[in-house]
């Protein structure tokens, strides 16, 4: 049928737009996209499935159409933004709640009737004291529901905009809505007709001539509108006019008295509301006077019950005399009672004024913020009057209305929304809490007129007007309603119990519908999984082409169909078919894996679409992130311009000429250049010769030619080193050499003995080594660098037993090694003994010679061992003799020094002495008493020097010294063997008179005595030796004076040498 096809097309278009809104919440739909929905001829109920659009427009149709349509359009715009925010991936921080005191919300959404109902459709169903919020158990909003409601809000806002612009394709829509509203108003007026006829017999007439009889008040609707405001374009009764125009923004409006109003009943606006006389036609006795052919409009209205406190008020009253709430106030719940039982109301405050809840300051009615603390006005929780002391607040009713009150309180009435039979006064249903029109269902058996003719009842004791009186209705209807109420309360109890356990109300209701169990929560835990599996299996059997169904899809279908198994299977199949069609329209059919994606993601189309898109883009992602080298293009193509454009665009070269230069270098034969190297070089220069040199730099170590950007260069020199040589050199230096050997492999710079160059060099070398070395080698570099820094600390010590270094900050001579836990002397490096305590190192050594049998057994070898070699730079001790080469290389700090005088050895061109004659060779500057020179003396000459200065020396082994097995010198030396270096005894022949030592070690023994006693060997120099020493130290060739004899010449040279080159503390050996 055409109607069904139009409805189907409308739903398809509507679902497409909702899906687009879910995918992109910020998407703006054009008028062309919305036209299929706007041009539809379906009724409003079929076009707006969630939103009650007709009621929303009718409830706000007051005044000029353009004014209220603009107001409604603005409110819908804000509501649309609420929906889009809920659909956005980055929702606002406080998306879960909406505050009523928000100025934007209060001036737009809350200014129209039905705005809060739209928020409840979004999911804001939890009532808060100051707003609405999502339920606590709901972590995320229902995207489908939110998208559908947002689309309908958007559609209605667009329709209203088109109506205002007179461009709506169905312009008669607004007229139809307004005609329906007029018909509804007339229907409600006709419903009052029987009641009015019963109260006041006579025809119910309405004024036919405008202005002949004033209409009802625009604000309260109960009293006649006797005052007309041209600015507001509304008619108000005097009481409402006083309240409405008391606002500062409307205080300047001028009002006019409508014609046909008696001047006696007109109230001056200058009088307060409490001083205004009541209209004369409000007496209830006057309603029964048959002489009145037409009732006064004011007397055609009934006394009204307050919906909050059930107080019976007179017809002309705008606010309830008990709780100060307006006549149109909806039914409210109990509030928190104050200390006087007034529910927190303050009767001392003037009507309309309000007290700040923070500072209790009394503010004017028009004030929005407190005048003292500037905090906003908060809504007061409503309450019922429950204390007997509140009777003083209520005005005593008229004696004539007491009979009407008794009759009205004995009435029962049906709610027009839920058809519940109510017996309490007022028109707020106790079941659905909604207000109904005041149409009593049953009347008292006697008419009001007969009861009124008997005169007023006798006055009695005052009674509470707010207490409802019990009444009864028909037994069958009452029983039916009681049963419905009992079942409803039971269902509500089950739902609350389920929500406490994490089950939603739909699950509880569906469980009851499916199983009829009395314990639905237990059934959901035990039986629901099997039911869902059965639904999924039956759905798969019904249409095997749709693939397997997930339990999530079965669950949603089962809940949507309220537990009906067959309908759930149909819904599951229908939903899956629609989702497959949606994915297929997007380019993903079943052959692309759409069925499997839907199953994996529980039927979620957006997640399934994301998965399918990810699978389709996977080859592109792999190709994009592939770490392999890019294919090298061919540079021999005939289209040179195309190649130049490619270089210019892809590699961002500075100019067209640079791109042509790069292409010419790439086309040269032989082709030894890489593309990246050429591009990098061309960016720095455009000189072809310079670029060729830049692209062919030779390694200073191996001679391999590489581009300059691949070479490594140190900051200390201009040598260029290829990556392989750089990595290999520094790896070997780290693993097999000292930290000071990490210099340039080509030129050997810088000199790492200079502390000023050391810091700057290693700071830049660290960055280069991090990118070139292996992680273990780089870690070793940092370890050695740290040790080198620690060795420069003046409090650094080397253990004399295990060669472990540590920082020793104590002042005592006794130090304990943290590694081997051996104790030794800080100064002499000998193993600590109790005899050393309180003695100097020299006294302790003499004590060892005289009292230690082991020391005596070793003889002079122990003396030489104790007077071993100490590195002057790092203080590391070597228990070795000085025989052999005097050039010593410290294994710890790589310092080169003389083992006799501890002066440094200098490499080629490193000597700081400006007048040095041997600067171009490895050399050292020794004092004249150094073993370096005295080892050439004979033992007898050394003995003579000691004898001349009365120094005792040994010529025979000390008493108790043991001989070495096999004979030979027993002094320990470091000897080079095929496997490395080894410490062992000297083993050379020991001549007689040499104290059991070989000739070299006996000379070392004698020289150590000469150095210990600071003896100057120059006293035994011959003339030739004096001239050589003078030339060596003073850099001049001495000549004898004229007539100077040789002895005088020798004495003069000796005096000059000893005075100008003394043997003082400048010798490093004496400072150790």
Curated annotation (Swiss-Prot):
Family membership: Belongs to the RBR family.
UBA domain mapped to chain residues: 564-615
Tissue spec: Expressed in both normal and transformed breast epithelial cell lines.
Native organism: Homo sapiens (Human)
Annotated keywords: Cytoplasm, Disease variant, Isopeptide bond, Metal-binding, Phosphoprotein, Repeat, Transferase, Ubl conjugation, Ubl conjugation pathway, Zinc, Zinc-finger
InterPro entries for the chain: Bbox1_RNF31-like, BRcat_RBR_RNF31-like, IBR_dom, PUB-like_dom_sf, PUB_domain, Rcat_RBR_RNF31-like, RNF31-like, RNF31-UBA
Positions bearing Phosphoserine: 383, 466
Class of this enzyme: transferase
Domain writeup: The PUB domain mediates interaction with the PIM motifs of VCP and RNF31, with a strong preference for RNF31. The RanBP2-type zinc fingers mediate the specific interaction with ubiquitin.
Effect ascribed to mutating residue 102 to A: Abolished interaction with SPATA2
Modification after translation: Autoubiquitinated. Interaction with OTULIN is required to suppress formation of 'Met-1'-linked polyubiquitin chains and prevent subsequent inactivation of the LUBAC complex.
Protein name: E3 ubiquitin-protein ligase RNF31
Phenotype for residue 735 to R: Reduced ubiquitination
Outcome of substituting residue 72 to P: In IMD115; likely pathogenic; may affect protein expression level; linear ubiquitination and NF-kappa-B activation are impaired in the patient's fibroblasts stimulated by IL1B or TNF, a phenotype that can be restored by the reintroduction of the wild-type protein; the genetic variation producing this missense variant does not affect splicing
Region annotation LDD domain: where it falls in the sequence: 910-1072
Residues that coordinate or bind Zn(2+) 5: 871, 874, 890, 893
UniProt binding sites for Zn(2+) 3: 799, 802, 817, 820
Annotated catalysed reactions: [E2 ubiquitin-conjugating enzyme]-S-ubiquitinyl-L-cysteine + [acceptor protein]-L-lysine = [E2 ubiquitin-conjugating enzyme]-L-cysteine + [acceptor protein]-N(6)-ubiquitinyl-L-lysine
Result of altering residue 99 to E: Reduced interaction with OTULIN
Binding site for Zn(2+) 6: 898, 901, 916, 925
